[in-house]
Amino acid sequence: MSTPLVQVKDAARWFDVSPPWLERKLAGKPRVMLRAVDGVSFEINRGETLALVGESGCGKSTVARMLVGLYGLTRGDIRFDGQPLSRMSEPGGRELRKRLQMIFQDPYASLNPRWRVGRIIAEPMLTHTKMTPAERTARVGDLLRQVGLDPSDQSRYPHQFSGGQRQRISIARALAVNPEFLVCDEPTSALDVSVQAQVLNLMKDLQRELGLTYLFISHNLAVVHHVADRVGVMYLGRMVEVAPRDELFARPRHPYTRMLLAAIPDIDGTGKPRTAVAGEVPNPLNPPSGCTFHPRCPHANERCRGEAPVGRMAGGAVVACHAVEEGRIAG
């Protein structure tokens, strides 16, 4: 079996959100660490789309930024095609960096309003290639055609385009240096619903044509069902379930995954019993001991309150849940 393109093992990213040093010393306060991502592990195979889902603040976007080197690791290991991602900051790491690119969430904020579209798309080529100006102009025109725009658009400014067109420009920029792996951080969440499907279908077409691999971040489960091959579910910085898309939607195992799917309106599901999950997301600065989901879980017991679960195989899924492991709920 071929080696996965992306391998993430026990990756964590903590942020120091303590008050200033002098204030802490005078008040006798300890340092405060926000565990945005706290030990996630997963793999992404070549040509595959792995989607990460979860409520706001669960760490999805932090994982995205870790995978392209925008955030360093507090602990753990991330490898791209067998190479440690830390090599991107070393001499010679530019070749590795250009193989993975990112599409950002907000097409209104991620494009420089003072630059023409041609310069925006050509910027990665200036850094990573030795193309002549004429070659860059021709390449920009080809990229614009590839994402459904006209080559003449490279002389225009971002404000002259709609949101969907701006995101197409962002996609063209990400493709400028022929990457193998794209990290897509909620690329359609800022777009009108009528435009979302067009952009998603474009991304799927590009994946087939170019053999791309995607990490797709989203909170919209309908979008995830449309684009993903496998789905990872995050809660308070931890991965609670990873499963093939069809298996996860047909047979969710972790109680949190069940809660997310139960929130999807289902016209045909009238009369089906639904289990409401009480409580709110805990304070990430002071997360619960053991399984962080236990205050909201109807299946929690003493083990859940005192021992953090690890991911274990359950059918075709990897689930971090004591209740599933012990057979207290169907796994």
Each predicted region: which residue ranges?
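A short, proline-enriched helix->beta-strand linker immediately N-terminal to the Walker B motif
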Residues: 176-180
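P-loop NTP-binding/switch modules centered on Walker-like glycine-rich loops
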Residues: 183, 187, 191, 195-272
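Short catalytic/signature loops enriched in Gly
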Residues: 2-4, 17-28, 33, 242-331
